[in-house]
């Protein structure tokens, strides 16, 4: 995988930094694992905008990813690595010995032809999935479940990983990239190794149009709006907003704690590191 800085032959290419992966499949995705993906434009079922700055973009198919990795005891072969427009990580098309194909997240170092497996009897190597009770303490894992059988929820983006730092009774303690330490049931599954495509963080889109291709619309500053549109709006000439930064709905927007899930507080051993 190479990081290429383009020559400034135009304003849009002056700041363009591309991540080129020659190992990715050049053809179409596997049709049996595609699903329809409708555009919402950031609107909910009543037509109101619930997420700002969304709209347009290239048409996409959703790839059905196997986040449960519950096909135990059946070896699989990685057929190819593919680009997925729905996530930062690349995905791998795997063929199981019984003939079934599934998409999984491509682990760091995974290549076409690799053999992988799931279950308690799987070898301790990158790409294999098993319950946390069978993973050695100190191992680096990704695609971790929070509830047994629910499917992976933690460490799924490009370059992400979690470290297993302890195991005590029914729970394993994980250290997340944010610095948070969290308890997870030992029956939850995880995949060994890191998520691939870690160079994704080095890319630069280079121009606003590249954001539009991805369905991201412009973000307008509150101080550039009218008072009816934003708490920072209005005033004669340029202003600083006149108050601490808030969202369009008046909620403090820099460093304000919004988490209120007391039900799962008991599983957090240490909160994430402060920036």
From Swiss-Prot:
Disulfide bonds: none annotated. The keyword rRNA-binding applies. The keyword Isomerase does not apply. InterPro entries: NA-bd_OB-fold (IPR012340), Rib_uL2_dom2 (IPR014722), Ribosomal_uL2 (IPR002171), Ribosomal_uL2_bac/org-type (IPR005880), Ribosomal_uL2_C (IPR022669), Ribosomal_uL2_CS (IPR022671), Ribosomal_uL2_dom3 (IPR014726), Ribosomal_uL2_RNA-bd_dom (IPR022666). Keywords: Ribonucleoprotein, Ribosomal protein, RNA-binding, rRNA-binding. Signal peptide: none annotated. GO terms for biological process: cytoplasmic translation. GO terms for cellular component: large ribosomal subunit. Residues 223-275 are annotated as: Disordered. GO terms for molecular function: rRNA binding; structural constituent of ribosome; transferase activity. It comes from the Bacteria. Part of the 50S ribosomal subunit. Forms a bridge to the 30S subunit in the 70S ribosome. One of the primary rRNA binding proteins. Required for association of the 30S and 50S subunits to form the 70S ribosome, for tRNA binding and peptide bond formation. It has been suggested to have peptidyltransferase activity; this is somewhat controversial. Makes several contacts with the 16S rRNA in the 70S ribosome. Belongs to the universal ribosomal protein uL2 family. This is Large ribosomal subunit protein uL2. It comes from Shewanella halifaxensis (strain HAW-EB4). The gene is rplB.
